[in-house]
A protein has these predicted regions:
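Extracellular carbohydrate-recognition regions
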Residues: 27-46, 214
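Extracellular glycan-recognition surfaces and repeat-rich motifs
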Residues: 37-68
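Localized edge beta-strand/strand-to-loop motifs within extracellular or lumenal beta-rich domains
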Residues: 145-159
Length: 992
């Protein structure tokens, strides 16, 4: 065991060292470091230097010592040379007295040579002993700009280039005393700071043999990158026989005509277009740039009425000038929402510049990009949000680094700036900055090992911010593919794998599940758009285009499965030409059949308290919350009534075609969401800034395998806030769901609390399809009253359409209220940031169990049976195959022997005992019997790093397999499971 551990650690260390090779490479010929991963090895030859990596950059600063300010810091990883090339890329911040060191002898403070920028604006070349040449001139350095300084030295010859322009060329360097530069010295490369306290912000360091680093930029690569970006936005190849393309172009042309005709082109104008309803002042700026971008698309797309129209081009440029000079997007000041200035505007602005390209004067391109660069200096810095319509100086949040989708949004703009400014360092910075956003995390924002995606620290956001992240990363990787900036294949493969496991299980009929869309569920959809379906499909196609062959086919098969149910929808709702051509290519590819449901079975997303089950005819999902995950997010006037969306909300998708769709969120009763146990006391619309509410409880999660699962949630509403005020809620409950192939058994116990309203468990709250006919039937007959309450053994919501009926069985005859309710609403009522006054209506059927105002240890039990019929329900009630073994605060357990199913949630800190299974810790356990084999799937939903000891039934002889961290004591028949680092994921043992 000890030897194995030693070899494993040795292998791991070797693997780790290899993993850094992309960001820091050294060979006999060359060395490169972009400081994206590690600092490297440095040695102070003179003085003392502070070095740290922050936001993919090396910050290096000298200190004042008794000997003065002189400091020389050598990078020993770069090796020793007597001749070669050395290049640094740095951001100029107004500092002086800094430069390169070469041929530096380790340990000899008098044996080095230097090329440095001085306080008088000149450069100096020389070495200790008063041997300096100080009259080397270059263009003035401009604060905030990025520069590449390349030094080429060989014998007595020295050449220096600044941003590809030669500033010094001397084949035989001679000092004023007549001596020549020591060309035979061999030494290390480094950095020098002197004369005063100074800092240097370094983006990269490169060294190599003479002529190994090109002194002049390859401008063709920037042209190629710009063309690739441009071709994603427009097409210059128009085929009148391609019906979807013709429709796309005609729609673009029509939209452009509407915008162009309404554009204010007067010299005295105050706005280009009138303020759009709901726009804040900063959002209005984004809208104006978005309109100019659409006009740019029409100008560049062949087949529109405005293709290469010189009058439109002049008006677009005039509009851009107006927005920069008159509306304040000049790089100096800002107001309102940071997102508009750093994401919304730059992406549309850069898109316009990519399309217009060489149609605009080069000095205009530089003027525009310089303004954008002030707001987006790098992918890491984020501005504060300020008051609207009051200009203030740029204020970046100190000691802060962007994460997740915000990082990729900024990185995409930095990439665009790098291409337009022909700045390699910006392109490299953009690429390096996105690597960590799809590397898995264990806390905070990002993707987790189980596929969860978190943004804003504790909000499940795969469908919204996760989609933005994938789009941004995908576009960056697609743009740089087949260029010198292309990401290495392993990194791309890791990204693709992350996307596969994080997105595919969370999609139903092409739409992201609402439980992972955060506050975005309150945004009004476009008239033709369903949820986040089209956006997700297009993003997955972008990723598929980058993926290794096997993953590419998997993603394309998945997307085609969803798209081919309504291809016209996906062809007619594209964001740009790239979406259209990817969709057309997929639909025409006969090798991709799309005939298999992309995901079947169950999956627990423990790191965001979500669960899904997918079958060929229906899909279910659970939204829960804990001390790790917030119950909901409200902010920017969005999701004002999302209070109970994670109180155990149970999503059941079937063939009704309307559930959780466009009309659902503005019309559903927000106090009675399906699956929840709630205190229905009236709450105020949530208007506070980015509200999140976590629970005191840790026990949330479960265990899943194949198409079965057991899930649980310790519900605790104590500490719940409404607009910053702590509510007097004290509702508590233990809620469990036992999931089988064709049913979900829901148990509740320990339901206690006090309210002035009522505490209820919502069995279901179903939106009806207006085109379907429904009937509610109980074991006592048809229910036609608008509101009816009585004891019931079962209920059936019967539809005249296939796979749209649902049965509800109550194992212990329960008082169930049935209500019919017609509701109307608008998205404006739940979202003032993206308001829509369109009125939606919905007919609902509610099934509820009322626990009263002061329940103490109340409980419930019901079974949801998708696709049920009256006959199936009657048979189910008579079969007696369902056994509820326990429904208490300490244990909830269900057995279905005919399905080989046993599910147990042990709630107590000391565990418990039932069904010949004993544990000393709180766990969730799923036991599955198949012929002679039994599989135990066990999780610790509290996510504490504990060892659980579990005694199993003595009904097996052999252990076939065990997960890592699991051991078995045959003498006591006890499992020991180390849950350290499992983060809620389950362990398995298979026995026979």
């Amino acid at each position: 065991m000890t030897k194995k551990l030693f070899y494993f650690i040795a292998f791991l260390l070797v693997s780790i060292s290899v993993s850094f090779t992309f960001s820091q490479r050294a060979t006999a010929e060359s060395y490169t470091s972009d400081f994206s991963n590690q600092l490297g090895t440095w040695e102070d030859l003179v003085g003392q230097v502070d070095r740290k990596i922050s936001q993919g950059q090396l910050n290096i600063a000298n200190q004042k010592l008794s000997t003065g300010y002189e400091s020389i810091s050598l990078n020993t990883d770069a090796g020793n040379r007597s001749s070669g090339d050395v290049q640094i890329t740095f951001v100029y911040k107004g500092q002086t007295n800094f430069g390169l060191v070469f041929r530096a002898g380790t340990g000899n403070t008098k044996n080095y040579q230097s090329f440095a920028y001085m306080s008088n604006g000149n450069w100096q070349l020389g070495q200790p002993g008063g041997k300096w040449i100080t009259d080397i001139h270059s263009q003035s350095l401009e604060i905030g700009q990025t520069y590449k300084l390349l030094l080429r030295y060989q014998g007595t010859s020295v050449k220096a280039y600044l941003n590809s322009k030669i500033i010094y060329d001397n084949p035989h360097v001679t000092y004023s005393d007549g001596s020549t530069i020591n060309g035979d010295w061999t030494g290390a490369t480094g950095l020098r700071l002197f004369g005063n306290l100074s800092q240097l912000l370094l983006l990269s360091l490169k060294t190599g043999e003479v002529n190994s680093i090109p002194e002049v930029l390859d401008t063709q690569q920037f042209i190629n990158l710009r063309d690739k970006w441009k071709q994603q936005l427009i097409t210059e190849n128009y085929d009148s026989n391609n019906a979807p393309l013709v429709k796309y172009v005609n729609t673009l042309s029509k939209n452009a005509q509407t915008l162009y005709q309404s554009m204010n082109r007067s010299p005295e104008r105050k706005e280009l277009w009138p303020l759009k309803a709901g726009d804040t002042p900063s959002a209005n700026l984004t809208t104006q740039f978005s309109n100019l971008y659409l006009l740019s698309q029409a100008y560049g797309t062949k087949g529109t009425d405005y293709y290469l129209n010189p009058e439109l081009l002049a008006d677009i440029q005039s509009g851009l000038d107006f927005m920069v000079s008159q509306k304040g997007y000049d790089g100096q000041k800002y107001y309102g929402n940071w997102w508009d200035w750093q994401v919304g505007i730059p992406q549309k602005f850069i898109g316009s510049l990519m399309i217009l390209g060489d149609k605009l004067p080069s000095d205009k391109i530089q003027e525009y990009t310089k303004a954008i660069q002030s707001y987006v200096p790098n992918p890491y810095q984020q501005l504060y949000t300020k008051a609207q319509d009051v200009f203030v100086d740029l204020a970046f949040i100190p000691n802060f680094s962007t994460t997740g989708a915000n990082r990729t949004d900024l990185a995409l703009s930095v990439l665009g700036l790098g291409i337009l400014q022909e700045d390699e360092s910006k392109i490299e910075l953009a690429s390096n900055s996105i690597k960590e956003v799809f590397q898995t995390v264990t806390k905070g924002d990002g993707f987790y090992p189980d596929g969860s995606f978190i943004q804003h620290n504790n909000i499940p956001y795969t469908g919204s911010y996760g989609n933005v992240l994938v789009k941004g990363v995908g576009q960056i990787l697609a743009t740089t593919k087949d260029s010198s900036f292309e990401m290495d294949s392993q990194t791309v493969s890791n990204f693709v794998s992350t996307v596969e496991q994080s997105f595919i299980p969370l999609i139903y009929q092409g739409t992201m599940l609402p439980g992972v869309n955060g506050r975005s569920i309150s945004r009004a959809p476009k008239d033709t758009q369903v949820g986040y379906g089209s956006t997700t499909m297009y993003n997955l196609l972008i990723v598929a285009n980058l993926a290794p062959e096997e993953s590419q086919k998997k993603l394309q098969e998945a997307v085609k499965y969803w798209m081919q149910t309504n291809p016209d929808y996906y062809l007619n709702n594209t964001r740009d030409y790239n979406d259209l051509q990817l969709t057309l290519s997929l639909m025409a590819n006969t090798a991709i059949t799309g005939d298999m449901l992309p995901f079947t079975g169950t999956k627990v997303f423990a790191s965001m308290d979500r669960f899904v089950q997918n079958n060929p005819t229906y899909m279910t999902s659970l939204s829960l919350y804990s001390n790790r995950t917030s119950s909901f997010e409200a902010g920017n006037g969005e999701n004002k009534r999302g209070w109970h969306t994670a109180d155990g909300m149970f999503y059941l998708y079937n063939n009704d075609g309307v559930q959780f769709g466009n009309s659902y969120w503005p019309t559903v009763d927000p106090y009675r969401l399906p699956g929840t146990t709630v205190d229905t006391v009236a709450l105020q619309d949530e208007n506070s800034s980015f509200t999140t509410v976590t629970s005191p409880e840790t026990w949330v999660g479960g265990a899943a395998a194949e198409n079965q699962a057991v899930m649980g949630m310790a519900l605790n509403k104590q500490g719940t806030k409404n607009n910053g005020t702590v509510l007097p809620m004290n509702l508590r409950a233990k809620k469990s769901w036992f999931v089988l192939e064709d049913q979900t058994i829901a148990l509740g116990a320990g339901i206690s609390g006090d309210t002035t309203a009522s505490i209820e468990t919502v069995v279901d709250n179903r939106l009806l399809n207006d085109a379907y006919h429904y009937q509610v039937i109980s074991n006592k007959g048809n229910i036609t009253d608008a509101s009816e309450e009585s004891k019931k053994d079962w209920l059936l919501l019967r539809s005249d359409h296939q796979n749209a009926s649902i049965g509800y069985y109550f194992p212990t005859s329960s008082d169930v209220t049935v209500q019919s309710e017609k509701r109307t609403g608008t998205y404006a009522a739940i979202n003032s940031a993206f308001p829509s006054d369109k009125t939606y209506s919905g007919e609902y059927r509610k099934f509820m169990i009322n626990h009263g105002q002061h329940p103490q240890n109340a409980n419930y039990a019901y079974v949801i049976l998708p696709e049920a019929t009256q006959e199936k329900l009657k048979n189910y009630t008579q079969d007696n195959t369902l056994k509820i073994l326990a429904n208490t605060e300490s244990i909830q357990a269900v057995q279905m022997e005919t399905a080989g199913y046993l599910g147990i949630n042990f709630w107590a800190a000391t565990g418990g005992s039932i069904a010949d299974i004993t544990t000393d810790k709180p766990i969730s356990l799923l036991k599955q019997n198949k012929q002679t084999q039994t599989t135990y799937t066990i999780a610790n939903p509290t996510q504490t790093n504990e060892i659980a000891h579990i005694q199993l039934p003595k009904d097996f002889k052999y252990i076939l397999s065990m997960s890592d961290g699991v051991s078995f004591d045959e003498a006591t028949h006890t499992l020991s499971i180390d849950f350290s680092g499992s983060a809620g994921s389950a362990k398995q043992i298979v026995v026979e």
